[in-house]
Structures are given as C-alpha cells and as structure tokens.
Amino acid sequence: MQPQYQMGYDRAITVFSPDGRLYQVEYAREAVKRGTTAVGIKCNDGIVLLVDKRVNSKLLEPSSIEKIFKIDNHIGVASSGLVGDARSLVDRARVESQVNRVSYDEQIDVEMLSKKLCDHMQTYTQFGGARPYGTALLIAGISDGQFRLFETDPSGTLLEYKATGIGIGRNAVMKVFEEEYNPEASIRDAILLGLKALHAATEGKFDVNTVEIGVVNNDTPAFRKMSRQEVASFVEQIEQS
C-alpha cells in the first residue's frame, strides 16, 4: 500500500508531490538502477565504454544482446535500463547526427548531441499522455580534438565526467574509480581499470561473452566496438590478476 502522502501524485507525470517530487521520474531512475552496469572512462589518448550484458540463460545468444551503439564515426553510447527505450534514443541520436551532417557538412559536436537528447528526454517529464524514458546513456566521443564523456538521466539532466558508471553496479564502479582513476592512463590501462570496476560490480561474474567494449582514440579518431578476440585478451588479464 502506498504511503498517504504519496497517493495520487505518482499517477500523473505532470503533478508534483507536496515536497516537490515527480514520482514517475524517480521510478524511471529506479529502472536504470536495476539495469546492467555500464562504465565510461576518459583517458590520456581516448575514451572507453564497457558494459556487462548479463546473459541470464545458457540458451541465449550473447551476440544478440547489444548495449553499446555507434551513433556516428566519432560518437558511441552505452546504455543501462530499458533496452527498448535506449534503442529509441539511439535512433534519434543517429538522425540528429545525420541531419547535422547534411545541413552543415560537418560532424555534430558531442556536447550538442548530448544536449539535444536530454532536451528530448526532458519533454517526457513535462507533458501528459507519455512516460519518462527508463534508460540512461553514457555518450562518448571526440570533438575538436577533445575527448568528451557525458551521462544522461531520465529527467533530462546532463553531466560530464572523467569516469563514471550507471546501472545496478554504479556504487561499486565509482568506488574503484575514486581510488584508482588516473587521467594520464593509456587506452589499454583504462580498459583494464574498466574491467576491474565491472569485476567488482558483478562480483566476478563476467566473461568474454558478457562483456562489450567500445573505444575512440587518437590513433583512429573514430568510434569502434572491439572484436571478441580483443575483449578476450583483456578479460584474461583480469581473470589472472
């Protein structure tokens, strides 16, 4: 049974509770907190995105689970929460990127794209007949030679980080980052740190089939997802340490 003070205020997205809360937005955040763990790390020569795909059945094909998406040549995102909602935002981000390229003959700025997505997410907290997006994104990319890492929120909030995590293992991830993050680290070291954080978040319950990694670096300033063989080589190092 709902508390007396809460009854009625969580049924409409446009109604504030007496203490200034939008319960539907808070419930959407809970969907993110229950989602799989995703981490992003900005380092000296690039950005790394890593996700735990949480394969719950041996009958499931791990390759069918996608949590890291390429938006444009220079931008990639990782998601946590409702996968369908994440795909909807990914499709919108791709369209925004294409429109910018056609209109201005240039790649869209990472921060501009992030703000456009958050503006869109915010509208779903303000009008009736819709619900907030039950997903959060880590948006990583390069603009004007600078690496940028942003985190979105179901409320439309946008924050920039050096290293962060979303999903059920966020607290464990942030503890590892606060103790060991080094902005001068290489891509290789950042990947190993990200895997160490995922290892802590999942209590060691991950392997090459459940980990997905995406990178953008100075060598090839384009976002790409690592192959299974590349992921396996890094996972082995964590398992042996």
Curated annotation (Swiss-Prot):
Keyword Repressor in annotation: no
SUPFAM superfamilies: N-terminal nucleophile aminohydrolases (Ntn hydrolases)
Organism: Methanosphaerula palustris (strain ATCC BAA-1556 / DSM 19958 / E1-9c)
UniProt family annotation: Belongs to the peptidase T1A family.
Cellular component, GO annotation: cytoplasm; proteasome core complex, alpha-subunit complex
UniProt note on regulation of activity: The formation of the proteasomal ATPase PAN-20S proteasome complex, via the docking of the C-termini of PAN into the intersubunit pockets in the alpha-rings, triggers opening of the gate for substrate entry. Interconversion between the open-gate and close-gate conformations leads to a dynamic regulation of the 20S proteasome proteolysis activity.
Subunit structure: The 20S proteasome core is composed of 14 alpha and 14 beta subunits that assemble into four stacked heptameric rings, resulting in a barrel-shaped structure. The two inner rings, each composed of seven catalytic beta subunits, are sandwiched by two outer rings, each composed of seven alpha subunits. The catalytic chamber with the active sites is on the inside of the barrel. Has a gated structure, the ends of the cylinder being occluded by the N-termini of the alpha-subunits. Is capped at one or both ends by the proteasome regulatory ATPase, PAN.
Keyword Cytoplasm attributed: yes
Function: Component of the proteasome core, a large protease complex with broad specificity involved in protein degradation.
SMART domains registered for this protein in UniProt: Proteasome_A_N
GO BP terms: proteasomal protein catabolic process; ubiquitin-dependent protein catabolic process
Family matches, as Pfam families: Proteasome, Proteasome_A_N
Superkingdom to which the source organism belongs: Archaea
Any one GO molecular-function label of the UniProt entry: threonine-type endopeptidase activity
Subcellular localization: Cytoplasm
Keywords: Cytoplasm, Proteasome
Entry protein name: Proteasome subunit alpha
